[in-house]
C-alpha cells in the first residue's frame, strides 16, 4: 500500500465509485488529471475525488488526501489507474474529481457514507 493511501476501499465500494465516475463522465461533469482535480477542489466545485493507488511516482497525488480533508471533500481510492482512466475515456488517470453527480443523489450519499465507514475501519469486518 502506498504511503498516501490512508484507508482500504472495499471492492463493492470501488465498483460503485467507478460506476458513478462513468455516469458523471457521460454528462461531462468530471475533471481528470491531478492538476484539474486540484483546481476543482480549490474552487469548491468538487463533490468527490477518486485517487488511484498505483500512481508512480507517488508524489503526483501524495497531497490530494490532505487537500481534500482541508476542504472537506470526500475522497476514495481505486486500485488501478487504468480502471479509473477507462471510465473517463483515457488510458489511465491518477485522479478524477466529480463536480456534478447528476441525478445520482442516493448513490452519492451511499458512497460518502461507505467512505466514512472505510475511514473509521468499520468496513474491514464486512469483507
Swiss-Prot record:
Cellular localisation: Cytoplasm
Major site of localization recorded for this protein: cytoplasm
Domain of life: Archaea
Alphabetical UniProt keywords: Cytoplasm, Ribonucleoprotein, Ribosomal protein, RNA-binding, rRNA-binding, tRNA processing
Entries under PROSITE patterns matching the protein: RIBOSOMAL_L7AE (PS01082)
One MF term in the entry's GO annotations: rRNA binding
InterPro entries, A to Z: eL8/uL1-like (IPR050257), Ribosomal_eL30-like_sf (IPR029064), Ribosomal_eL8-like_CS (IPR004037), Ribosomal_eL8/eL30/eS12/Gad45 (IPR004038), Ribosomal_eL8/Nhp2 (IPR018492), Ribosomal_eL8_arc (IPR022481)
Biological processes per GO annotation: ribosome biogenesis; translation; tRNA 5'-leader removal
GO cellular component, one term: cytoplasm
Function according to Swiss-Prot or TrEMBL: Multifunctional RNA-binding protein that recognizes the K-turn motif in ribosomal RNA, the RNA component of RNase P, box H/ACA, box C/D and box C'/D' sRNAs.
Assembly and oligomerization: Part of the 50S ribosomal subunit. Probably part of the RNase P complex.
Similarity annotation: Belongs to the eukaryotic ribosomal protein eL8 family.
Name of the protein in question: Large ribosomal subunit protein eL8
Amino acid at each position: 500500500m502506498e504511503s498516501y493511501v490512508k484507508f482500504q476501499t472495499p471492492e463493492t465500494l470501488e465498483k460503485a465509485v467507478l460506476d458513478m465516475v462513468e455516469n458523471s463522465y457521460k454528462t461531462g461533469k468530471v475533471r481528470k488529471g491531478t492538476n484539474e482535480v486540484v483546481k476543482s477542489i480549490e474552487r469548491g466545485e468538487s463533490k468527490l475525488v477518486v485517487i488511484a493507488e498505483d500512481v508512480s511516482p507517488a508524489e503526483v497525488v501524495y497531497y490530494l488526501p490532505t487537500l481534500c480533508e482541508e476542504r472537506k471533500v470526500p475522497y476514495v481510492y481505486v486500485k488501478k489507474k487504468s480502471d479509473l482512466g477507462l471510465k473517463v475515456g483515457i488510458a489511465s488517470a491518477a485522479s478524477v474529481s466529480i463536480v456534478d453527480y447528476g441525478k445520482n443523489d442516493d448513490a452519492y450519499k451511499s458512497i460518502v457514507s461507505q467512505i466514512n465507514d472505510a475511514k473509521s475501519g468499520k468496513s474491514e469486518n464486512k469483507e
